[in-house]
Amino acid sequence: MRLPAQLLGLLMLWVSGSSGDIVMTQSPLSLPVTPGEPASISCRSSQSLLHSNGYNYLDWYLQKPGQSPQLLIYLGSNRASGVPDRFSGSGSGTDFTLKISRVEAEDVGVYYCMQALQTP
């Protein structure tokens, strides 16, 4: 059974900073999925998000229909409290991936990656 809603969204985000704008690009634009199957979303930053402290300042959010965005992954690979272990984040520098090991119907929504290295 295919899930009837769009799983993914594309986000391009510009944030001003002293070293120039950081542009975040996600792919794919949308991804039809089947419950029980894996899914993967890619995110690329125009600048490295790896801080001198060794952390990647990249967060993943899920916005379910009719709800506010909820934090899934912070600092590139850390699951937020209450997030199922089927969600995992990986990557470093400019290239990151969110993986869902086994998609469930409740996972439908729009997924966003967000850099947290620069703030307005």
UniProtKB/Swiss-Prot annotation:
Disulfide bonds: C43-C113
Region (Framework-3): 82-113
Segments of this protein annotated with the region Complementarity-determining-3: 114-120
InterPro entries xref list: Ig-like_dom, Ig-like_dom_sf, Ig-like_fold, Ig_V-set, IgV_Light_Chain
Region (Framework-1): 21-43
One example of a Gene Ontology biological process annotation: adaptive immune response
Keywords for this protein: Adaptive immunity, Cell membrane, Disulfide bond, Immunity, Immunoglobulin, Immunoglobulin domain, Membrane, Secreted, Signal
Disulfide bond found in the keyword field: yes
Keyword Membrane carried by entry: yes
Region (Framework-2): 60-74
One term of GO molecular function: antigen binding
Subcellular location(s) per record: Secreted; Cell membrane
Domain Ig-like: 20-120
SMART domains in the cross-refs: IGv
Signal peptide range in chain numbering: 1-19
Region (Complementarity-determining-2): 75-81
Region (Complementarity-determining-1): 44-59
Cellular component terms (Gene Ontology): blood microparticle; extracellular exosome; extracellular region; immunoglobulin complex; plasma membrane
PANTHER family: IMMUNOGLOBULIN LIGHT CHAIN (PTHR23267)
Subunit structure, as described in the record: Immunoglobulins are composed of two identical heavy chains and two identical light chains; disulfide-linked.
Job of this protein: V region of the variable domain of immunoglobulin light chains that participates in the antigen recognition. Immunoglobulins, also known as antibodies, are membrane-bound or secreted glycoproteins produced by B lymphocytes. In the recognition phase of humoral immunity, the membrane-bound immunoglobulins serve as receptors which, upon binding of a specific antigen, trigger the clonal expansion and differentiation of B lymphocytes into immunoglobulins-secreting plasma cells.
Protein name, as recorded: Immunoglobulin kappa variable 2D-28
Organism: Homo sapiens (Human)
Gene that this sequence comes from: IGKV2D-28
